[in-house]
Design a protein with these regions (language model features):
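Negatively charged
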Residues: 18-295
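Sec-dependent N-terminal signal peptides
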Residues: 7-9
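Positively charged n-region of N-terminal signal peptides that target proteins for export
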Residues: 1-4
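N-terminal signal peptide c-region/cleavage motif recognized by signal peptidases
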Residues: 14-16
Length: 295
């Protein structure tokens, strides 16, 4: 390993006792050591050269240790562990510059590391991030996802996930499609979310087994697509009468086979609705609780 040693000799002519200062610079470490007192070197947060995404994937596929890989300049992590096991500790990775997390752990069925400390503040795409990650259940509620514009299918099929994420700032997101589809264990509060930018909500809670949380505070004023949003839900039965559905176009099968739902939503504004076939077929909804246009 290459080293450069700079020795400075303080001369007595300057009224300073003789002392030696050593600066040691290696490929992976930098340390300033006063009087060369034998202090140990302090590592940076990674070891080696900065990697590109392609180089990181090659390292992962090689089976070598990537726990301290230098990924600080990678902005796109989409799919890097898709369908793969994560065999080394990545909890210390610096993700501060990553914008795209799409499918990062999709179908990584054994992944369950605590990545709650990751810096997600640059993230804009969280789509499919944990899709099919059937073991993942870590406390990521403190993530800063405030720049996220899509959460499509983020937890689809993540059957173990059941962590509070109600403090997330999702106010910039336009797409929530399939976000919790078949996330059968998920049952956490979401009523505080600001979804006012959301346009796409299709299949968001489809086939959720346990989810039954209030959503009546949601600002749905920009929602256009809500097909299958609560289809085949088994527990959901919460009031939604406060929703502003004036821009809603596609309501097809929204409550299809929603076997528990029977709330009065007859006041919904359906003036923009163009698709609403099978709106409540197979559900527990009483026709009197259905918007007149959809009966």
């Amino acid at each position: 390993m290459k080293k450069t040693i700079l020795s400075l000799l303080a001369l007595s002519a300057f009224g300073i006792s003789q002392a030696q200062y050593v600066v040691v610079i290696t490929e992976n470490y930098v340390i300033a050591n006063a009087e060369n007192n034998g202090d140990t070197e302090q590592p940076k947060n990674c070891v080696g050269e900065e990697l590109s995404k392609a180089e990181l994937i090659a390292l992962i596929d090689s089976g070598q240790d990537y726990s301290q890989a230098c990924i600080n300049t990678i902005t796109n992590m989409s799919g890097v562990f898709s369908g793969k096991s994560v065999d080394y500790d990545i909890t210390g990775w610096d993700t501060a510059h990553v914008q795209y997390f799409g499918g990062m752990f999709s179908d990584s069925t054994s992944f369950n590391q605590d990545i709650s400390g990751w810096d997600m503040s640059s993230g804009i795409d969280f789509s499919y991030m944990f899709k099919g990650a059937t073991s993942f259940n870590q406390p990521i509620g403190l993530w800063n996802v405030g720049n996220g514009i899509t959460f499509k299918a983020m937890f689809q099929g993540a059957t173990a996930f059941n962590q509070p994420i109600d403090t997330w700032n999702v106010s910039k997101s336009k797409n929530f499609q399939n976000m919790f589809t078949s996330a059968t264990a998920f049952n956490q509060p979401l009523n505080s979310w600001n979804v006012s930018s959301g346009e796409e909500f299709s299949q968001m809670f489809q086939n959720t087994r346990d989810f039954n949380q209030p959503l009546n505070n949601w600002d749905m004023s920009n929602a256009k697509f809500m097909s299958y949003m609560f289809a085949t839900t088994q527990s959901f039965n919460q009031p939604l009468n406060n929703w502003n559905t004036a821009k809603g176009f596609n309501f097809s099968s929204m409550f299809y086979n929603a076997t528990a739902f029977n709330q009065n939503i007859s006041n919904w504004d359906t003036s923009s609705a163009g698709m609403y076939n099978s709106f409540y077929v197979g559900s527990a909804l009483n026709s009197a609780n259905v918007p007149a246009k959809f009966r």
